[in-house]
């Protein structure tokens, strides 16, 4: 069953697949294993570096553990994005410009 967040993920995946050159990413499926709070998209872009995207449906924010993981990524020199597809894509576009 599709969830509102899955539609946001689909749109972000389409954008990354079709609109961004020199990019590698994956979408981890933790399923109760691994480190909690890991973002929905983990990737690396040439000349920009490591990034993570936490996808949220409209009106929702990251959980405390997701905020913590995003801070850890930023502290290590990575870039994080969170929100709906529209918000994330706009911020990603500004980052790669």
What label would you give each PLM region?
Residues 1-97:
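Catalytic phosphate/metal-binding cores of nucleic-acid and nucleotide-processing enzymes, i.e., regions
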């Amino acid at each position: 069953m599709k969830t509102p967040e899955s539609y946001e993920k689909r749109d972000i995946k389409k954008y990354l697949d079709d609109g961004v050159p020199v990019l590698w990413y994956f979408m981890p499926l933790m399923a109760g294993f691994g480190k909690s709070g890991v973002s929905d998209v983990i990737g690396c872009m040439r000349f920009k570096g490591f990034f993570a995207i936490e996808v949220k449906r409209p009106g929702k924010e990251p959980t405390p553990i997701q905020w913590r993981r995003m801070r850890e990524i930023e502290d290590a020199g990575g870039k994080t994005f969170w929100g709906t597809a529209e918000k994330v894509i706009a911020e990603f576009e500004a980052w790669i410009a």
